[in-house]
């Protein structure tokens, strides 16, 4: 199947799958798509371990890494630590989680705790933490680096260009798409509200043609549809 996405990423099918599981990354890429590993909840050392495993099992096929760098936070040193993130979680969520663990006889210490993941996320959404993850990612033969929240910082886009890696970014409105293209993003991940609503409230099937029309004056930038896509 021939498309610009296939040409850019050197894949057989224009299918890109985000996952937190390295095994899924490998499986998707071996099936002709491009697996993308979510890294925001990892330390640089953990990411290195995961990517080394992928390199050893993926037979040289294309894959990518996804980070989460809110543009408004990327160059700021605001205190946004694990305690603050954890305090935002409703008690109902914590109770639901505890109930599931109890029903299935799972010890909480067998899982990565919310607090630990929140600690990494708080660090990795700031410039220093994000750059540390990107340094690890770009030391491996990735084909795509994606930002899952907003326009990537200029330095992230430049790191992609310097390493000959395509930069993708999620968006939820036509204006978001224009902002991303102007920032130099190579691939637009158009994420409708069916993806969980984190990018906006517009339905995927409405958003895709809106974005396609909006970016026409800015060049031929490929679009990946996300949200309600099975």
PLM regions with names:
Residues 191, 221-230:
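Glycine-rich adenosine-cofactor-binding loop
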Residues 1-219:
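Active-site entrance/lid segments in N-terminal catalytic domains of soluble metabolic enzymes
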